[in-house]
A protein has these predicted regions:
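Long, contiguous N-terminal structural blocks used for assembly/anchoring
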Residues: 1-104, 110-114
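Secondary-structure transition/turn motif
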Residues: 103-106, 141-143
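Acidic, proline/glycine-rich low-complexity IDRs
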Residues: 116-143
Length: 143
């Protein structure tokens, strides 16, 4: 089955937007901002070490690049409370996204590893698990 060029084109457009950043360096920026992705916002998302571990896991499984897309900045006392509760630096500013775009290698072995990781993350949420169609990207979206 040929790759879905529309799907890859959309992902390529997303990673080029000004609100998109390379995920690991974004998460590890030493500026005391609370950064999170995924899950129903701040409470169930990935933050701190858990977020870094998740992105590093994708890289170990063969991801060429992991991009956080649609990053927004939020400020308020609620952010400070959640950061302290999670043992993260005390701050009232957070950057967050509910989307990651994962560039997968062209070799099918790496694609299988990353597709399996995607299935482990989302399969329980009743999404259709993608198959290896030669696509260049996987899309992680938590709503």
């Amino acid at each position: 089955m040929p790759p879905d060029n529309h799907y890859d084109t959309k992902r390529e457009q997303e990673v080029m937007q000004p609100d998109s950043v390379e995920a690991l360096s974004w998460l590890q920026t030493p500026d005391n901002l609370f950064r999170t992705f995924g899950g129903n916002g701040i409470r169930k998302g990935y933050a701190g070490k858990r977020a870094v571990d998740f992105v590093q896991c994708l890289c170990r499984r063969g991801a060429v690049r992991v991009t956080a897309v649609g990053v927004v900045r939020v400020q308020g006392e609620y952010v400070r409370h959640e950061a302290i509760k999670r043992g993260l630096p005390e701050t009232d500013v957070m950057e967050a996204t509910d989307r990651l775009v994962v560039e997968i290698p062209s070799e099918s072995g790496g694609q299988v590893e990353l597709i399996n990781q995607w299935a482990n993350t989302f399969g329980r949420r009743m999404f259709d698990v993608p198959t290896d169609t030669g696509q260049k990207y996987l899309f992680y979206w938590w709503d």
